[in-house]
Amino acid sequence: MGRGSGANSIVAFSLWITDVDPLELDLYFERFINPYRTSPPDFDIDFSWDERDDVTDYIFKRYGREHVALLATYSTFKGKSILREVGKVYGLPKAEIDMLINYPEKKEYQNDITAKIFQLDRLMEGFPNHLSIHAGGIIISQTPLTRYTALEMMPKGFPITHWDMHVAEDIGYYKYDILSQRGLGHIKESVDIIKENIGVEIDIHQVTNFKTDEGVKAQLRSGHCIGCFYVESPAMRGLLKKLRCDNYLSLVAASSIIRPGVAQSGMMREYIFRFHNPNNFKYIHPIMEKLLQETYGVMVYQEDVIKVAHHFAGIDLADADILRRGMSGKSRSKNEMLRITDTFFNNCNERGYPEAISKEVWRQIESFSGYSFSKAHSASFAVESFQSLYLKTYFPKEFMVAVINNFGGFYRTEFYVHEARMNGANILAPCVHHSNHLTRIIGDDIYLGFVHVKELEKKSIRAILKERQERPFDDLEDFISRTKIHLEQLIILIKIGALRFTGLGKKQLLWEVHLLLGNKNKIPESLELFKVKSQKFELPTLTHTKLDDALDELELLGFPLCSPFELLKEQIKEEEYSLKGKEDTNARILKSIKDIERRQKVWSSKLSTDLEALESALDSLSHVDIKNEL
């Protein structure tokens, strides 16, 4: 999937590099290429996370390893790490270095050596430390790269240059960004699973149909977007509900205004108000109304910075592009930014703008600092969100399996399992007859993959899958003799319920496996001429409960497969599950709080939790004065 400013190109859309129609959104082509642009145009291309290495390998083979290399980034010396590294050079023990870092002002740690260390600390700040690999940058050279730079082999087997992206641009090399993301993996695998499970083929590029689909629009408007690319976080779902977003244009804007700068500057709140009250606000200046009418006078995209700087403040397009890069965190010169800042205010003063208006416009520009999207980038993300939403709306079980298998979502696996259960799936523990390495769906039954079982070795999984291809397992003895899995691994499989095909309970299976393997000296396979039948013993009746299963699952999966409500000693009455008509009343929470996100402040903490209900889920954000109690 092509994204970023390259999606401004109608040629890219025509070649199926992107699914973004630039004419539909009146995208600003000059953001991609213009005569005044100070850097080469950049085209970001995303692949599924599990395909990027294959694509990179193809590029090296296609153009030759002498002509291709990954770009480097410079990791620099920073802060306390300088003291630590220089202290090692001077032979100081770790304990003394720690004291020097934590208590630099203490006189007992001040001597000629420490004075030299602190002097070097100031001098080395920002110096290169070591090379790292750029997130996805690749350069291709017509002549062998070793004519221009040394190459260094990385553990993945691909060489890197001794340049970063800025040096490569200065020399004249164009960078190709081969990036990856897991959202594409969700979509790609969903399409495959849907075809396999229910026989429906989907053309995922029919984005125009997805944008106008009433079911998808309702899903978007309600914020039911768990698992969907870029729109599943609590903040994003909350924004969608506030905007009552149900169309492409609104989602494109929402994808950009959710970024930290706009939210912290208060402009996100202002945008929501203006979105719902288009006749109840005033534009800060007539020029701003002309430039930003589509976004109600709020700068939302990087293009807005360019347009406002050029048309409002009279900054030429070359400097406007430098300003845009600076706001994106890509500027290399503080002096350049200071010069453009002075130019902005001087030009505004010459044009007779009130100082308050000039400062407010600049404040909005500064909100883009470090993290901002071009409109084309937001549009690319919105298209992928619509693709995810379509799959979740009409094929929720298969979609959630794909989300679970690709990992890397906003929530833990447990949350996605609960979401699948709420959409009608039967969640089943791993099974040696039905489960694969990854999670699998058969009809409405979802069998968790062996990959989720802690301490289960890959060679054990491979042995199970290999033998199962030959024929099903007859019983416990047949399973043990064919897979050759040792006792500790068998105990894990029993506790997670993977050997339930035997018809025996977990405790009985544990007895059986210890009788078969517990005290047996392992005989080399080549020396065992005849298969000796094991002796059978009568065992007492052994029982286990749902609570036993839940505890085993907590230990091996990290979460129980049943609903926590099923484990209650006294079952809650059905009507008590509903919250209707119970506003302003206290409620008890039945949920273990596992993930706590605390942002420490002087006066409070933020407690962010995910709460599960029987047929729903709730994100909770609390301001609490219990900084030291959690």
Residue ranges and their predicted role:
Residues 1-630:
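Noncatalytic, beta-rich nucleic-acid-contacting surfaces in large DNA/RNA-processing enzymes
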